């Protein structure tokens, strides 16, 4: 997908999501930021550095990226080996390495699996290992390219919680490419793409409470909002909620007052 005149900033310490229909250019942006694709024109700046051949190694050391297929990211023979892979490539002393591995595994709740082989892990556990490997390198920016897309519901929930916990506890900047409504709802800022261009930006509420904007990015109105509209027809007024959880909480309060 060609990216055309795309310009945006990701504030340091923020949780930003990029959304859009399949083929809108979301993953292309992730690969451009990681230096996996070369831009034809324009400029990309990360942590004050322009992305070019001279700065590529420095920038990659400040970025961690997790892709959607957990099987394609597991390199080591065990969980411990996989987390250690990047550290070994950077010649981190063995004594320091063990402490970093332990701390990174604790962050994603995989400490008891350090000696497990990848074949014994679920998809969600493999993604947690991928995140641990990224955290071990102490990046300033975490990029998740549809990291939950290939997981079952339990795995999705586990990864979303891990990502949010890391962001809240460390203050790391997170850029997540996702279709997940629950994840988008928790973001500070949303960038909406369509056909390689940015068509809308703003808070989750600004994007999802505007049906015209949703049509532009070819996304459906969240089910919670459709249900609210039907309840309104029955004389039950509710606030707009992006997620079902928010709507259910309001309905419970409504029921307790009856």
Features from the language model and the residues they span:
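Helix-to-loop junction immediately C-terminal to a conserved catalytic motif
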Residues: 34
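Conserved ABC transporter NBD signature motif
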Residues: 42-50, 59
């Amino acid at each position: 997908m060609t990216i055309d005149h795309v310009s945006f900033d990701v504030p340091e310490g923020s949780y930003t999501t990029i959304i859009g229909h399949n083929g809108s250019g979301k993953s292309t942006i992730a690969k451009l930021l990681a230096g996996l694709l070369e831009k034809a024109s324009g400029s990309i700046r990360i942590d004050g550095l322009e992305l070019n051949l001279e700065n590529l190694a420095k920038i990659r050391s400040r970025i961690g990226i997790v892709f959607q297929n957990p099987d394609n990211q597991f390199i080591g023979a065990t969980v411990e080996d996989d987390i250690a892979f990047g550290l070994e490539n950077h010649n981190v002393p063995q004594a320091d390495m063990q402490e970093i591995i332990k701390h990174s595994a604790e962050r994603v709740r995989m400490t008891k699996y350090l000696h497990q082989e990848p074949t014994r892990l679920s998809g969600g556990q493999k993604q947690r290992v991928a995140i641990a490997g990224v955290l071990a390198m102490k990046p300033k920016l975490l990029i998740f390219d549809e990291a939950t897309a290939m997981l079952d519901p339990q795995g999705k929930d586990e990864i979303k919680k891990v990502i949010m916990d890391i962001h809240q506890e460390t203050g790391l900047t997170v850029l997540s490419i996702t279709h997940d409504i629950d994840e988008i709802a928790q973001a500070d800022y949303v960038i909406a793409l369509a056909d390689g261009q940015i068509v809308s930006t703003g808070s989750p509420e600004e994007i999802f409470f505007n049906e015209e904007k949703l049509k532009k990015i070819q996304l459906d109105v969240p089910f919670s909002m459709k249900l609210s509209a039907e309840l309104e027809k029955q004389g039950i007024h509710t606030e707009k909620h992006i997620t079902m959880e928010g709507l259910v909480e309001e309905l419970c309060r409504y029921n307790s007052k009856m």
